[in-house]
Structures are given as C-alpha cells and as structure tokens.
Amino acid sequence: MINEIKNDAKDRMAKSVESLKTQMSKIRTGRAHPSLLDGIQVEYYGAATPLKQLANVVAEDARTLSISIFDRSMIQAVEKAILTSDLGLNPSSNGQTLRVPLPPLTEERRRDLTKIVRAEAEGARVAVRNIRRDANADLKALLKDKEISEDDDRRAQEEIQKLTDSFIKLVDDALAAKEKELMEI
C-alpha cells in the first residue's frame, strides 16, 4: 500500500518535471534548435498538420535552421505557417529548402523569456507539492482506516518529503540551466 502511494507520487512528479523540460525546450534561446518549430501547424490538404510530419528540420549552424520539406508544393504553406507563428522568424526559400535564420535576442526579450521560464518552473514546483499533498492525504486515509501504524505513516511521509525535495531540486536545476542559456549572448 505505502509503496504503491510512493511509486505513484514518484511517477507523477517525474512527469511534472518532464513536462517542464518539454515546455522549456520550446522557449527560444539564441541557439537554433529543431524543437523550436515543434508547435507549428501547417495547413495541409485542409487539415492542420504538425510541421515535423511534413518536413525534416535540422540545425544548420548555431543561428540557422534548415527545413527540408517532403512535398515541394508545400513550401509556401510552410513558409506562411512560420511567418504567422508568434516566434518572430522570417524564413527564406531557395526552391528546395527553407532556411530560417534566428535573429539575436534583445536584452528586453531575454528578460521576458526569463520571466516566462520562472513562471513555468514555479508551476512545476506547485504541481510537485500538490502531488505530495495528495500522497500524504492517501497515507492519512490509510492511517484513519487503521491499515498502517502511525510510525509507518510518519516514515512514509518523510520518504515522500525526500522525493518532493529531490524533484524540486530537478526543477530548480532545469530553471538555472535555462536561465543561463537565455542570458548567454
């Protein structure tokens, strides 16, 4: 029983941290990274289709993404989707591929992105703490039903607290790494 609660809490906390890392990877830094375009949807035969299903995106160098589109007739549609996205990117076409140069981030934009990253990290911390609260409530229910002793309850709560601390440290580490990446020029 106690192990099930701990394992469930651990799995849910891990998912929260993984979700944070995914969100952070979508936030643009000064470096070109293919995941930057993951959220872009392209109108393809009347349906919104993710760009990664229509093209191969690679980082050509530190400041340029190269997009090789599988269906050449889709170049204009992909270009339009990138232009209308809120990423502030301006692709150029050579008929075969699209090149997307990444403009350097301004100091103001870096600060804004840092605020966004901090808010994402705080959301992840809150999620981890809520999972801890749920696990502790489950333990209290077991204690109330006399399925576990008070000592077992206390021991399990301490272990869940250690889990919480370790996952919050992972969140803080991810935040520090992303802030450092954002502030690099």
UniProtKB/Swiss-Prot annotation:
SUPFAM superfamilies: Ribosome recycling factor, RRF. Pfam families: RRF. GO terms for molecular function: ribosomal large subunit binding. Keywords: Cytoplasm, Protein biosynthesis. It comes from the Bacteria. CDD domains: RRF (cd00520). GO terms for cellular component: cytosol. It is found in: Cytoplasm. InterPro entries: Ribosome_recyc_fac (IPR002661), Ribosome_recyc_fac_dom (IPR023584), RRF_sf (IPR036191). Its main location: cytoplasm. One of its GO terms (biological process) is cytoplasmic translational termination. The keyword Protein biosynthesis applies. NCBIfam families: frr. Belongs to the RRF family. HAMAP family: RRF. Responsible for the release of ribosomes from messenger RNA at the termination of protein biosynthesis. May increase the efficiency of translation by recycling ribosomes from one round of translation to another. This is Ribosome-recycling factor. It comes from Aeromonas salmonicida (strain A449).
